[in-house]
Amino acid sequence: MVQLLFKFLIQVGATFVELSRNEIGNKNLLLLIHHAGSLLLSMFGSFSNYPVQKFLDMLDERCLTLIASEFDSYFENLVKDRVGNYVVQRLIWGFKRTGIDLPHSLTSVLVTRSIHLCKHRYGYQVIEAFDRSTRLA
């Protein structure tokens, strides 16, 4: 079962960008991610963030912006999460890689809450990644 799931994720990952550009493929991918994400989380626990991080490495700026807009409502919780902070760091580096700015809604959370997040056990890692990405810009 585990090998089949990984094989499936690799095949989806290989065509993720192409599928996300197609309107029907994009809707199906969004549904798939929600179900596959919960399945991965239940099967692998904290290691389920690795496939998500790999997907973020492959995406172009349009897809990254779409995913960042999905994070809007619970972005601070992701930053503070033991596993979610790694996904947010990868998202920040994805924006840096593509040469576009992190959306204002996410940047404002990082800037306005930076003192609080710097004191947080996991939040400080995201603040450091954000600082490095803005310094290197």
Curated annotation (Swiss-Prot):
Keywords attached to this entry: Cytoplasm, Repeat, RNA-binding, Translation regulation
Gene Ontology terms: biological process: regulation of translation
GO CC annotation terms, alphabetical: cytoplasm
Protein location: Cytoplasm
GO molecular function, one term: RNA binding
Major localization listed first in the record, in broad terms: cytoplasm
Annotated Pumilio repeat ranges: 70-105, 108-137
Domain notes: The pumilio repeats mediate the association with RNA by packing together to form a right-handed superhelix that approximates a half donut. The number as well as the specific sequence of the repeats determine the specificity for target mRNAs.
Functional note: Sequence-specific RNA-binding protein that regulates translation and mRNA stability by binding the 3'-UTR of target mRNAs.
Protein name stated in the entry: Putative pumilio homolog 25
Native species: Arabidopsis thaliana (Mouse-ear cress)
Organism phylogeny: Eukaryota, Viridiplantae, Streptophyta, Embryophyta, Tracheophyta
